Amino acid sequence: MISSTALPTAATKPPSVPPSIERLLLLPLIALPILWLAGYFFPPINHDVAAILDVSARWVNGERLYVEVIDENLPLTFVVHALPVLTSKILPGDPSFWFTAWVVAGIFASFWACRRLVKLVPSADHALTEALLPPVLLFLFTVLPNEHFGQREHILFVACAPYMIASMARGEGILLSRGSSIAIGLVAGVALAMKPHYLAIPAALELYLLIRRGWRTTLTDPIPWAIGLVAVAHFVSMYTIFREYGEFVMPLAVEAYAPIGDTGWRGVLTSNVLAPTLIALVIFGLIAVIFTKTAAARVLVVFGIGAAISAIAQAKGWPYHVLPALSAAILLAALTVRRRSTATCRSAAAAITCRWR
């Protein structure tokens, strides 16, 4: 008979992988998306992005926004897109190049922040999670957008990813530092305020966190206040700094936007763009909530629901509208894979131990 003392038990830790080997295995997952980013510097740029950059350039060059150059997009959209235009006046390169450069810089900044924030989520305190989620996020930032790179939905997800992961930590009782919370809220707020539909995301998230944490914790959390501050300041600017937009352009935009396309929100629900995303969100959301049993998974589901509501509210069914919701569904799948992989490994170790006892 083989002695059980010579064999590993369920409590025995598997042999650890040297850090150098781990980094080597993760290298392709990090390097390939970075190489993919290089392709975005070659023309053509996304046509919607090009149109917004053109309006921003005319505004920066002296034309009066909403008077001499009229566009239905909100003022903050042109403020954000004025940054690459202004950069091109200081440094070599045209606005489209610097737009791509600024988005790429934002991707790396968001990726760095997300890697740090993942370590604060108690239920994500696992080597596989810390190894898997950042490369998946980098894939969602770089490869998934493809021809929609730079669309506001893409910028939204990149800017809100730290807010999303911070909310996963907040949902599990973690309090972030005041400085980090304000920075996360302000960055997310700028992206969320570029379209009114986007505000469905923080509305859903903060409502869930309010129910889970109560009024006291919610009212002392700087993140929703920072987001709200940006949204309110933007709204006020529509009737002060950009008065022509609030008084004349916005009523015309509301009237003109609805007839664009012939789908409507009911058609969007069953379209070949949103319907698969909703199905994936429901399936992976249920699996994640049932198998992981964590507040972080539920927060991620709520983020996806808010993003889906945003896409439905736009009532167009355009592919890039679902990018944030689709990204949430993919992250839910990654989160579930990690949890089930861990459980499977533990079950396998226990089974082997029992076999040889």
Residue spans of the language-model regions?
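Perimembrane helix-loop-helix junctions
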Residues: S3-T5, P18, I201-G228, I290, ...
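Membrane-interface transmembrane helices that cradle and orient dolichyl/undecaprenyl
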Residues: S123-H126, I155, A161-A183, A280-A296, ...
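Membrane-interface alpha helices of multi-pass inner-membrane proteins
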Residues: R178-P196, P202-L207, G304-A313
